[in-house]
Design a protein with these regions (language model features):
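Soluble extracytoplasmic regions of secretory-pathway and membrane proteins
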Residues: 8, 12-31, 35-870, 874-893
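Short, low-complexity, charge-dense intrinsically disordered segments
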Residues: 897-943, 947
Length: 947
């Protein structure tokens, strides 16, 4: 009895703490405006808990109580006679009390465990059809996604409850001596015990027959064959075996009911033997033999129709069916006109990688030890009227980095991060450091984008509770040796009262909350401040992307954008991807205000049946994407994580012919890149470019493909991010008969360039580390341009500087073997004429006064380290002037891509050098050093002609 009371105390204490958590969660849901989510979830959990708890109590207590009553009618004793005196000294009244208490405690435990299935319950009763039928049973896929999971849950719990009830009843009968074994093989069972236990065992088999029917449906998710889903063996062998198993299992149940009236063990024994044979041989050994002896030797012939199904349903499940397929000629004849038409693309080539830029941001702009830049995000803004790709990062508060970690500092004083930095992807200072459009504390902006509300109370690492509007002013930001303080003015946080202070002191396990005089009835408490946790609390059924990104709203507020996915592993025939299931949609865009924590959820894919189901379950929770303010709608982007998964599936499932698919004749892979951490797969990258046959530039997410176990490129994938084409994915295939260099091959060619290798070795020997940036393949018109930045960082310092940019391209056919591409010189911008560009001087007007193109002629170039000597410059100038006297010839143009914008930049000594010859195409590589007497440079286009 004492043990039972001990367990009862534990259960009550658990319920108390659970009640505290539920109460504070209710207050939080009220504050964020999603109280309906709380109540629907809570009431459903109570409903499901009651369903499972009552079911367990009724079945378990009813059977054990019945066993206790029936066992008192007769007992076997050693003299082989049935008597009516209980062998236990414990009275029936005490035993009944113990049974009742145990039943209640176990029922509470089952109820708590069962409440976890609330999502399955709601999906079962709110299922949305997919309007797609599986090819085997012709049922809508929604049946397998929404209804089978709850049926399986009911089956498992029914088996558990019946099994526990049967064991408990049998144990009670055994202790009451309702069984007697008479050597050598006779077992006597009291009539009441035999009847009761036979009914329980029969119920177990009847429920087991239902489980066999569920297993019949699970055949759609078989993993035996060459692909996921039922193959030849499952359809022709295992399918009918499972049907037989359903019948045999039901007959087993009937045999135990017959045993009640006919006291012959042979009937249930024979039925059970048949059950074991079908279960072991029919579902295991026999299909394995068919697979090994019949299918494997004739796999492609027998599995072909099932390969077709796997291809079809996998493409549907990952959205590959909607990927547009286009040809990309991969020509090698970029012209001046091509560059002019794609000037915006050239200006937005990203020169800063996330890792070195994050390190540099930390050194230059963290300001204090307790600030931290967690991540760098890519986005696009209209900057002073120009469409630009930028990189930005939030300056968050890092509690672990604070030198004085007291309770007051962590929960009252230091409550928020402050501001963000924003800069172009392609500009640096004269020291090789990133240029900032927005920087410092408080934020200083040099462009028409301003931050008016820089405080960050909710972020990627804000994972602890904090109190605002207290008597103690909050630290806002430092100014020199002094600090500026403030009070929170927003609507975020849960309002407090004395009662709530007591509850939160219990919730957070801190007596200081209750004793602090700084926390008043007008104070507010903020928790669930980490944005991913905040959104997950509101929509736990959404799988969130790990890469949230920051957006500056037109009003100057800082907002977090977070992509949400609906996934399932219940899509028939679809190939699973790691732990993501086998169906995936980017259905939700979450927007979280960094100041007041407001959460808005928008439907980015309203056609998805899974999100439609949850929209029915939680009405009013989601908004249409069209309801997002226009200023924010311009910043939604295709998530890189989703495109990576689609790309990895497309690498195999672009092959729709089952014969080609089976042989993996055209298998693709994601290119691998080299870096400081070794080789790893390339990740998708954003750029601003004009897609082939499109009229204007747009923000695009790119990822190249290579053939499996090869390094040349076979295709590239583009996901469009701007309206009205948001969400459209296009794969551009290269001609199979043409060799197009892949990133790894370009890396190898760069490694073989003597000038670069020499410079890298020199840097690495001087106490510095040369860091190779990510190599980007940028499609321009019908050609590919490769760009790789080089950074230099001191071994003991953490301030990477951009020192070189490597540009690789293929300059067209018709060049003589071994011919070197021509040299050229940079044009200097003329600030007196308001020129914002510098460029390569070539073509008509070169060497003149510039009247032909309205630009100044070349003047003397400054000397310095890495600058060609005067004689070399004279020869370069004469060759450039000679170029202007010859007409352009097709296939004779080459290009470089970097100039200055309002500043000077000079080429590095030996300007270019051909590395190899492939057929009649020269592989050209350019290695640049920047001489920056002014402040910054950027990346517009430059064209150079051969001499």
């Amino acid at each position: 009895m004492g043990i039972m009371l001990f367990f009862a105390a534990i259960v009550l204490l658990s319920l108390f703490w659970r009640g505290i958590e539920m109460l504070t969660d209710w207050w939080w849901f009220q504050e964020v405006g999603y109280e309906n989510v709380f109540w629907i979830t809570f009431l459903t959990q109570m409903k499901v808990a009651a369903l499972f708890g009552l079911a367990f109590f009724v079945i378990f207590y009813g059977n054990v109580f019945l066993a206790n009553r029936l066992s008192s009618r007769g007992y076997w004793v050693d003299k082989d006679e049935l008597i009516h005196t209980p062998p236990w000294e414990l009275g029936n009244q005490s035993l009944s009390a113990i049974i009742l208490l145990a039943s209640v405690l176990f029922s509470l435990f089952v109820a708590l465990r069962g409440s976890a299935h609330w999502e399955d319950y709601l999906q079962f009763f709110n299922a949305t059809p997919f309007q797609i039928s599986d090819p085997l049973f012709s049922r809508d896929i929604g049946f397998y996604v929404f209804q089978i999971p709850f049926l399986k849950t009911l089956y498992r719990w029914a088996m558990i409850i019946l099994a526990i009830s049967a064991v408990a009843s049998g144990l009670l009968y055994f202790l009451r001596r309702s069984f007697q074994f008479i050597p050598p093989k006779e077992l006597r069972v009291a009539p009441a015990a035999r009847t009761h236990l036979s009914i329980l065992i029969a119920c177990l088999f009847f429920v087991g027959a239902g489980g066999a029917w569920l297993e019949l449906n699970e055949i759609l998710f078989a993993k035996r064959g060459v692909v996921f889903g039922p193959g030849y063996t499952e359809v022709t062998t295992q399918l009918w075996v499972l049907k037989v198993l359903i019948v045999v299992t039901g007959l087993c149940g009937l045999s135990f009911l017959v045993f009640i009236f006919r006291r012959d063990w042979r009937v249930p024994a024979a039925a059970f033997a048949a059950f074991l044979i079908v279960s072991v041989v029919g579902t295991g050994i026999y299909p394995a033999l068919i697979q090994k002896l019949q299918v494997v030797p004739n796999e492609i012939v027998l599995e072909k129709p099932f390969l077709e199904r796997n291809i079809k349903y996998t493409r549907i499940a990952y959205g590959l069916k909607d990927v547009e397929d286009r040809e990309f000629p991969a020509e090698e004849n970029l012209t001046q006109a091509d560059l002019r038409r794609n000037d915006l693309t050239i200006k937005n080539i990203r020169l800063w990688d996330h890792a070195p830029l994050l390190t540099t941001y930390g050194q230059l702009q963290e300001i204090r030890t307790y600030y931290k830049f967690v991540d760098v995000d890519n986005d696009r803004y209209t900057v002073n009227g120009e469409f630009r790709q930028v990189m930005l990062s939030a300056r968050e508060l890092s509690y672990p980095a604070h030198p004085a970690r007291t309770w007051v500092n962590e929960h009252l004083n230091y409550t928020h991060g402050y501001g963000a930095v924003l800069g172009p992807v392609n500009r640096i200072t004269r020291e090789g450091l990133p240029e900032f459009f927005i920087k410092d504390i408080p934020p200083v902006s040099t462009i028409d984008i301003k931050i008016t509300r820089p405080e960050i109370y909710f972020g990627e690492i804000s994972n602890d509770y904090t109190f605002v509007r207290t008597k103690r002013p909050e630290f806002n930001y430092p100014v020199g040796e002094k600090n500026v303080y403030s009070q929170y003015e927003g609507k975020g946080g849960v309002p407090l009262s004395f009662f709530r202070k007591v509850v939160y002191a219990l919730r957070f396990g801190s007596l200081t909350i209750l004793l602090s005089d700084d926390i008043t009835p007008g104070s507010r408490v903020m928790y669930y401040r980490k944005i991913s946790e905040r959104v997950s609390r509101i929509a736990p059924f959404i799988r969130l992307d790990s890469d949230a990104y920051l957006v500056i709203s037109p009003e100057g507020r800082l907002l977090w954008f977070l992509d949400g996915y609906t996934t399932t592993d219940r899509f028939p025939y679809s190939e699973p991807f790691r732990n993501m299931g086998n169906y995936m949609r980017n259905s939700v865009k979450a927007v979280v205000d960094a100041y007041d924590g407001t959460v808005e959820l928008y439907l980015s894919d309203p056609t998805d049946p899974i999100i439609q189901t949850f929209a029915k379950i939680f009405p009013g929770t989601f908004k249409a994407l069209e309801q997002m303010p226009a200023g924010l709608l311009r910043h939604i982007r295709y998530p890189p994580g989703f495109l990576s998964i689609q790309a990895k599936m497309l690498a195999t499932y672009h092959m729709e012919d089952p014969q080609v698919f089976y042989n993996k004749e055209d298998l693709w892979s994601i290119p691998r890149k080299s870096g400081t951490g070794g080789e790893r797969e390339m990740e998708p990258y954003y750029t601003i470019m004009k897609l082939p046959d499109e009229k204007k530039e747009e923000f695009v997410l790119l990822l190249p493909f290579t053939p499996s176990k090869k390094d040349n490129m076979s295709a590239w994938l583009a996901a469009r991010c701007d309206a009205p084409h948001y969400g459209k994915v296009v794969v551009y295939r290269f001609p199979k008969q043409k060799l197009v260099y892949g990133p790894r091959q370009i890396d190898a060619r760069i490694d073989q360039e003597a000038e670069i290798s020499k410079q890298l070795s020199l840097w690495n020997q001087r106490g510095s580390q040369a860091i190779r940036g990510n190599l980007l393949a940028i499609p321009i018109e019908k050609s590919i341009l490769y760009v790789q930045p080089l950074y230099l960082a001191a071994e003991k310092g953490q301030l990477p500087e951009l020192k070189r940019v490597i540009v690789v391209f293929f300059p067209g056919h018709g060049r003589k073997p071994g011919a070197c591409p021509p040299a050229g010189v940079w044009r200097r911008a003329d600030p007196r004429k308001g020129s914002a560009e510098s460029g390569w001087r070539s073509g008509s007007g070169a060497g003149s006064n510039g009247a032909a193109d309205g630009r100044r002629s070349l003047g003397p170039l400054p000397q310095g380290p890495g600058i060609p000597k005067t004689g070399q410059l004279d020869r370069l100038r004469r060759r450039a002037e000679e170029t202007g006297r010859h007409p352009e010839k097709p296939g004779k143009e080459t290009l470089t891509t970097f100039t200055t914008e309002g500043t000077e930049m000079k080429n590095f000594g030996k300007i270019q050098k051909p590395n190899c010859q492939i057929g009649d195409t020269i592989f050209c590589l350019y290695f640049y050093r920047f001489i920056l007497p002014a402040s910054v440079f950027s990346v517009p286009s430059v064209v150079r002609k051969p001499l």
